[in-house]
Amino acid sequence: MGLSDLIAGGMDATAATELLLNVVWTIVGATLVYFMQAGFAMCEAGFTRAKNTGNILMKNMMDFVLGSLFFFIFGFAIMHGTDWNGIIGIKGFFNPTTLADADGLFNGLPIGVFLIFHTVFCATSATIVSGSMAERTKFLAYLLYSAAISIFIYPVTGHWIWGGGWLAQMGFHDFAGSTAVHMVGGICALVGAKILGPRIGKYDKEGNARAIPGHNLSIAALGVFILWFCWFGFNCGSTTAASTNLGDIAMTTNLAAAAATLATLVVTWIRYGKPDVSMTFNGSLAGLVAITAGCDTVSNYSAIIIGLIAGILVVFSVEFFDKVAKIDDPVGAISVHGVCGFTGSILVGVFSPEYTLKTQVIGVLSTVDYVLVMAIIVFTIIDKTVGLRVTKEEELDGLDIHEHGCSAYADFNFRL
């Protein structure tokens, strides 16, 4: 309905105008978050080898496709349906529009607007895992995981945090999803990569890590720029209202990302003798992930400090998983989303006067516990049934040919 229709229906003109502005802003935010799929696709494709590019693109596409369908049918009801003991939603399955009030609103917005905004968030959490399991995962196995996270992993912890569940009642604060979106995806990435095992050639006989360079830093850089741009929709859009604090949220988001980028650049320059390109790009994302939980409540200088911490932490985290834990993560998603999502959520309790460190720690650790257990169950079942990993021949030849019968660069010959 337009403004005149709302007024004719008895709504105050000011309230009607505010509602329409909120609708427009939330839809803008949702479209920006949707376009993050393109950013993730470019990052993952650029940081991996050319022979697997088509597979990367297909996985990112299917994360959104499956997320849209399964979150609509099951996930939204679990996340935002009528609360049952603070643990899970129990109403709205198969038709989430039944959760709307008599005016068709849910949480102050038309139900469709609220639903699409959380749908794109669900797809974002799912797609984080793609890069960590890249270059050796069966396509069917990945589709099964993507459906699982959209149905009963992301929505359950999402209910705890955003759906009126026990963490929300306790006062846990995760404004735009450092925990609910990014850490959930990062934990799933950790479990998936661990069970899957490293790529062929990643470690020598002595267990020393070898670099497997991505094929296109230009594409990876484009992905980072897209993600940084879309993150303004991710964080600012989480107000689901055209409010005056949008500028503050945008500023803390940008400052944290900038500080993290600079911190990563300096650390890699010191440790490696030269500023590392791919690690610096991941530093940008680390800062964005870390600030997402508290972008609405911390000061500008606190945002800079959070960014600096994330930018430094991501370097050592990537090195730890690569060299100590021996978990092969081609794009660094475990560190960027899992570790920095965890850290950013904790730091809300340090830098925000409104929220306590104790509550933030409880919220983060409880989410880790649930997601870790469910991810282990899901990936183990998939591995024991259809199998997680492709054959040695398929991995060496590339997944594009064996999984999809095509090549992303059919007319080009690559030479290093």
Residue locations for each model-derived region?
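Hydrophobic alpha-helical transmembrane bundles of multi-pass membrane proteins
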Residues: 2-416
